[in-house]
A protein has these predicted regions:
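Short His-Asn-centered micro-motif
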Residues: 27-29, 48-49, 137-139, 154-157, ...
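Long, positively charged, glycine-interspersed low-complexity recognition regions
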Residues: 166-240
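Short, polar loop motifs at secondary-structure junctions
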Residues: 29-33, 121-122, 190-195
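Class I S-adenosyl-L-methionine-dependent methyltransferase module
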Residues: 41-138, 142-143
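Short loop/helix-cap segments at secondary-structure boundaries that form the rim of catalytic
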Residues: 37-40, 144-148, 193-202
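S-adenosyl-L-methionine
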Residues: 1-36, 40
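Hydrophobic "anchor" residues on beta-strands that sit immediately upstream
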Residues: 22, 45, 151
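Active-site segment flanking the S-adenosylmethionine/decSAM binding pocket
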Residues: 135-171
Length: 240
């Protein structure tokens, strides 16, 4: 499913790096591309996101919800104005059928005649067997209970972008909290940049575009960080 900042192309590489075993907690699950693959390696996976319509969609999918094959621009505008009429459908349309996968930022059109609703539906149906037993919760990331010994994965909004309800993401507070929970857990953070006390353990250059129908591609380097105090703990875990 189209989702701004989703890790669809990188999930197969990132998921194995997270390791396996007991419980994985994802603080910003988004489109769940990484999490869907990580379920193969962990006994339990908890997926959190503070976007209620996104979580409503995933919970409904677990219970048999089937997204539509086609969403017209009129239907798109209606759901944008009446979000609570069908939260699961709103969650699907708000991302899968929006320009750039950005929450209701304009009805997506493909100059080549592509069907964004059908494409999003197919990708979700393909991943749902892996997400069938995932626990989905909707909360601020600070409020997510972290089980003892769990692995934490954080893929926060890009610096400067807005969250649900147009609240700007506080990057400084995010890194402060990552330091705090790194005292008791191995925490992996997907980001482009990090403070000096966080170590990059993996990186890959990717090509992005603001609009696939225009010639505005640019390069970015996706990275995976852990706190410097977690390096020895991670090495010990990998040696076990």
């Amino acid at each position: 499913m189209r989702y701004q900042g989703g890790k669809a192309r990188l999930a197969k590489t990132i998921a194995p790096i997270l390791g396996g075993g007991g419980t994985l907690v994802s603080l910003f699950c988004g489109a769940c591309n990484v999490e869907a693959l990580a379920t193969r390696n962990f006994e339990n996976v908890i997926c959190n996101d503070n976007h209620p319509y996104l979580i409503a969609m995933f919970k409904a999918l677990q219970n048999g919800f089937e997204p539509p094959d086609v969403v017209t621009e009129e239907q798109y505008k209606y759901l944008k104005a009446n979000k609570d009429e069908n939260p699961a459908l709103t969650g699907f349309v708000g991302f899968a059928c929006s320009f750039g996968g950005r929450w209701f930022e304009g009805y997506a059109r493909d100059g080549n005649g592509g069907n964004y609703a059908l494409s999003g539906k197919r990708s979700l149906i393909k991943m749902m067997p892996n997400l069938r037993n995932v626990k989905f919760i909707c909360s601020d990331y600070h409020d997510v209970k972290l089980p003892d010994g769990c692995i934490v994965y954080a893929d926060p909004p890009y610096n400067g972008t807005k969250q649900f309800q147009n609240k700007k993401f506080d990057t400084d507070e995010f890194w402060r909290y990552m330091r705090l929970i790194s005292e008791d857990h191995i925490v992996f953070i997907s980001e482009l940049h990090a403070p000096d006390d966080f170590v990059c353990i993996w990186e890959k250059q990717v090509t992005r575009t603001l609009d696939r129908n225009k010639d505005n591609y640019f390069k970015a380097t996706e990275k995976l960080f852990i706190h410097q105090n977690n390096i020895k703990r991670l090495q010990q875990t990998n040696d076990e």
